[in-house]
Amino acid sequence: MDLDACMKVKSMNILFLTELLYPHGSGGELATYLWAQLLAESGRKVRVVTSSFPSEPERSERGNLEIFRLPTLGASASVKYCLLGRFDVLLSNFFRKLLAWADVVCIPRFWYSAIPVAKAYGKPVITHLHGYIPVCPVATLYDLSRNRICDSHNSCRPSCIIAHEKAHGKNFLETMGSTLLNSATWRYLRKLVELSDSVICVSKAQRDIIIAHMPSLTRKCYLIYNPLPELSEIEINGRDMGYFGGPSPLKGFNVLCSALRYVKNKVTIHATGFDPSKQGLIQFSNKSRILFYERLPQSLYEQIHKETHTVLVPSIWAEPFGYVVAEAILQGRLVIASKVGGVPEQVNGCPGVFSFESGDYRHLAELIEYVNDLSVETIRDLAAKNREVFLKRFDNKKVEQELMSVLDVVGH
């Protein structure tokens, strides 16, 4: 990028439109928050429009970062369809002023109805994909009705949507409503994404899948890894393991339970993202057990991390970029993860990461036993090497430069 282009990108006004923002949501929302923060700290003017929650101000400002919180923006159980109908926001004076201010509009989640509005105002749009929504209506590209990664190109199986919603605790009416909406409108969402000037994927694995299903995006689809949060190493005080994926079968909770039945020696798993009053405690015949916690604030996560030396990531879907993996390595933990999605890219070269084929619970059980038998000194040494390798490969300054290049392309 030449000096003039660099100065132009440096002075850009960037508008993020996202239904949720960290600390709400999951990995995609964390990535959006980190991007907004990173760009603001490097001198760009950044505005974010998101949903409001109790005790949060309607507007907050810190340096170059300004956040506007609108009521009930993401109140629907099916957020992507709720947002499609928010014409009261899209056609408001408030929104027109934001678009007039912006040089570039970024869509990091499901607010795709804003894409044609921004284009009508002559604003370039960057869509940031954290799942597979353009090629899969439930964004996972995993068919739970057949228990395998979906291979249905350009089609949508109602049985897949039904299985997905049931697995995530939806009742009959919610399941039928989701099936109807997803089957009827997901092709419309594809068309909206195609209007984007650039599409950013967060791993090579994700980009390859998206392009294979939508060749029309090939020339505008870029790979930029997510920025990393600033996390310090946490001292290891215990011999337990952690699982932070909640009850979702896509995150591999069923695989973990199956594996623990084959673990010969006792192991304790700290599992977050559950309703403790409903889940209680699972005790296995070998005296291994799972202790359940609800979704916790970062300070309480750190307390749990002190009791663990290894984080388990047994996902069965092709997760594009695993923040659980990244945070575990940055905080000085070993990782046992399935070889699926973008995770193998993340952990490449890390000596303290142990991988198994997705769904292979017997191999997972063997790895749990192997790691649990390692000495504390060996665990700490491997964890330190993990962090060193990881930080050399993933650098926030580098990913910022890569995003600047995309901003320069769409800004012309």
Language model segments and positions:
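Short hydrophobic beta-strand element within catalytic cores of glycosyltransferases
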Residues: T310, L334-A337
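Membrane-proximal helix-turn-helix segments that form the acceptor-binding/catalytic region
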Residues: R96, S145-V199
